[in-house]
Amino acid sequence: MGARKGRVLLAWELGDGLGHVGRLMPLATRLERDGYVPVLAVRDPAQALRVPAARRLPVLQAPYATPRGARASGFHARSFADILCVIGYEDEERLRAMLRAWRDLARLVRPALAIGDFSPTLALALRGSGVPVMLVGSGFALPPAQDGFFPEVNAEGRAIADREHLAASMRRASGAPRDATPAALVAGDWQGACTWPLLDPYRASRARPAIGPLGPTQAAGP
């Protein structure tokens, strides 16, 4: 066995179900093969550990924000900005706390690379930290950064985001420059939308086409 190359943090922040860990595990397997040490930080450890391959890895509780008030019930977002508002991005103090938690986790793990599935706060927290951030996920979970703001993808959804207030809160909480756009702030260093290009809601505005599924979601164990 060759020398270990360092740790890689594989994170799942938002959403439910096995799909998030299912996308991360093929990457974890390849990283192990290449000499890295994968560490999982997941929204729901019990759910993650239903995936057999995850049981051999260190599993940590990921920081995440619980949707608040009426917004948490029966809510359908019009754009990704509305998702961020539901979890508190317009509340600068709350966002600062979320960023602090992710940064503290990264300091403990000391990863050479972070990979996030539906993990915008991870990307925002590690921006400019020297730790590269690679993002994977469904098409909706990875809005393209080149548009500046988040395109609307659900005309029937409820728009709750105040664009200027959201942008200002994200910049102040993260220490980003005044010209940084919300989409760029959560874009990470590389994105791979794990859906077929035809099914990608951002296909008209995405510079790099969706890459397709990474691999089959591993079956849940007993």
Where are these regions (language model features)?
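Conserved nucleotide-sugar phosphate-binding/catalytic loop shared by glycosyltransferases and other
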Residues: 33-93
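Structural motif
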Residues: 7, 112-113, 190
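Short, acidic/turn-prone active-site loops that include or flank metal/cofactor-
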Residues: 62-68, 138-143, 215-216
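Acidic anion/phosphate-binding donor-loop and adjacent secondary structure
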Residues: 201-222
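Short, polar loop motifs at secondary-structure junctions
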Residues: 42-48, 117-121, 194-200
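Conserved nucleotide-sugar donor-binding subdomain of glycosyltransferases
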Residues: 75-115, 119-121, 158-182
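Active-site-proximal region of nucleotide-activated glycan assembly enzymes
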Residues: 132-208
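A short, glycine/small-residue-rich beta-strand->loop->alpha-helix junction that serves as a flexible
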Residues: 12-25
